Design a protein with these regions (language model features):
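Catalytic-site microenvironment of enzymes
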Residues: 2-18, 25-256
């Protein structure tokens, strides 16, 4: 009887020790978050993204014809949904409807963000679509942060410009700001995308966390389908909100 009790004791202690070791390992693993932008225009192609692990999040364009559908599908799977908000770029090009601009009043920005929240149900955060002119404007981004605070949304800075004012603008508000470290698909070349994916993994390993942004393009989807199943054991996929309290550093640098 004593032997049996001792054996159960050993088994229990061993299980507890293994559990503790797994918790420590998970805490030390590099955290990688992947967000797929520009969702809401091509449900057939975008459905391939919804076949990936549910830690992969989607950023939905608020005025896209299938915005509500794709946000709802993603949320029903337990995915994190962001609003992919059009913001004014530095380059001179035609602007999409309801593109946020530095010259807009607080009321106008509030109206646009309110509509976006209505069009993209279940959103818990927002990131910028283009936006180098808007995100580099401190007054403009302060208006954005005031609006986001009222909806309790975080802001993922896509870092389309190195002089982004998003973090400064959020000071004094309840809005958390996180930063993109890697763009996966600046090109449609699979080798380039694979290289960028590996870079994101290495940054997550070195810095403790990293956020990569990609798009629902065939080459990107193909590379992710190939590489996600063989993600290194010391890297864990997480949703962006899991990184809200992680050090953000300087982001991923300027991309035109």
């Amino acid at each position: 009887m004593v032997g049996k009790i001792d054996l159960r004791y050993v088994k229990t202690r061993t299980a507890l020790l293994i559990g503790c070791l797994l918790q420590v390992y998970a805490a030390q693993a590099g955290k990688l978050s992947i967000v797929i932008d520009d969702v809401g225009y091509r449900p057939h192609e975008e459905n391939a993204v919804l076949q990936m692990p549910t830690a992969i999040s989607v950023a939905v364009l608020p005025n896209a014809p299938h915005a509500r559908l794709m946000a709802t599908r993603a949320h029903s799977q337990g995915r994190e949904v962001l609003i992919h908000m059009p913001m004014a770029p530095l380059s001179k090009q035609p602007l999409e409807r309801d593109t946020l601009q530095p010259s807009m009043s607080s009321d106008e920005i509030q109206r646009i963000i309110r509509n976006a929240v209505n069009n993209v149900p279940y959103a818990v955060g927002m990131n910028n679509h283009m936006g180098s002119a808007m995100t580099s404007s401190l007054p403009g981004m302060q208006k954005v942060m005031q609006a986001l605070e009222s909806y309790r949304l975080y802001f993922l800075d896509s870092m389309t410009i190195g002089s982004s004012q998003a973090t400064r603008a959020a000071a004094g508000t309840g809005v958390k700001v996180i930063k993109r470290k890697v763009f996966l698909d600046d090109t449609a070349n699979e080798a380039d995308i694979r290289r960028q994916f590996n870079r994101a993994v290495e940054l997550a390993r070195r810095n403790g966390s990293a956020i990569a942004i990609g798009h629902p393009r065939p080459a990107t989807v193909k590379v992710l389908q190939q590489m996600l199943p063989s993600l290194p054991a010391d890297i864990v996929l997480v949703k962006p909100s899991a990184l809200l309290n992680e050090p953000q550093g300087n982001g991923g640098g300027y991309v035109p």
